[in-house]
Amino acid sequence: MPVAPASPRPPRRLAGWLGLLARIVVTVGLMAWAIVGGGVGRQQDGEPRGVEWGRFYELLSQADWPWWLAALAVTLAGQVVAGIRWAALARPLGFDFPNRFFVRRFFEGMFFSLCLPSSIGGDFVKAVRIGSSTQLRLLAGCSVLADRLTGLAALGVLVGTALIARNNELGTAATCGVFAGLLVAGLAAFWVALAVLDRAHAALPEGSTAREFVARVLPYRQRPSLVLLAVGWSFVVQLAGVAAVVLVARALGVVQPPLVWLSVVPLVALAMVLPISLGGFGVRENALEYLLRGYGVPSEAGVAIGLLWGVCTLLAGLVGGVLFLLERQPLAVPDPSEPAAA
């Protein structure tokens, strides 16, 4: 019998592999640029700036590793708190699981973020893992989006406060005033968005699928304390991230005022959201080197801090990978609107 020709690889799958290959190339290129090239903005006043290999190796070889272990512990604790924050936002939408369930899924999302573009690549996996149907996965996606937005709100308030206070040399009272003002502005933005959601629900036809879906998200509007609680947890998560970087820097003998770290680390976290590298690697190291150089930190120290911070993130993600391998099936909520399989 004649052998049937092999079917060509689906174009979408090929595009996915090409996209992954491109991101791997970009990640390797950015890491090489950070280590070999020495980061961004290589030259100023005719003098080259970059990593001095002898000092770079000396920094890493003489690192005070107990401080780095403390940074790893803070990183893991921050992800646990982030999982609890997600639980607070997902339960009102019908995902009635204990905190440990969401913490586990959050770590799994961290693992996939190591393999997917940017630092938010695992968000899609988190939504899929807790929903058993298309509608429930959309709802889960709403909870993940709300979780991400509350985190960005806290991050924006912190970096805005730090930058304004540092650039204007504000005292403690004035800094607290700036923080309160930015926090109120952020919460007001959430209130406006939820009010728009409420109006959209009222405008949709009775009995429509879209109206029923929006109704599932209305608890955020009906219980404003949910957003307040999530934003509060977000400040804990963001401060844990800053503390982890401070501890990594301390391990390398780099000490800066708190306002420096509060302004630099959130900006680096925002840069890592860009979908140009795997897990934010390369972006993290270049951004830290560039920003810290403005505060007198040598290039090799900035890159080394980024590398050791990245290792903390990598190990936290690998914890999620182990959890994923131990349990492959999602513990998802059955959708009552869909008939059970025979």
Please report, for each region that a protein language model flagged, where it lies by residue:
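Mid-bilayer segments of alpha-helical transmembrane spans in multi-pass integral membrane proteins
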Residues: 110-120, 148-157, 187
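Extended non-transmembrane interhelical loops and adjacent amphipathic helices
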Residues: 88-91, 103-132
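Membrane-interface alpha-helices at helix entry/exit sites of multi-pass transporters
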Residues: 99-104, 118, 122-123, 133-149, ...
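Transmembrane helix-loop junction
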Residues: 91, 114, 132, 250-251, ...
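Transmembrane alpha-helix termini and helix-breaking/packing motifs in multi-pass membrane transporters
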Residues: 156-168, 294
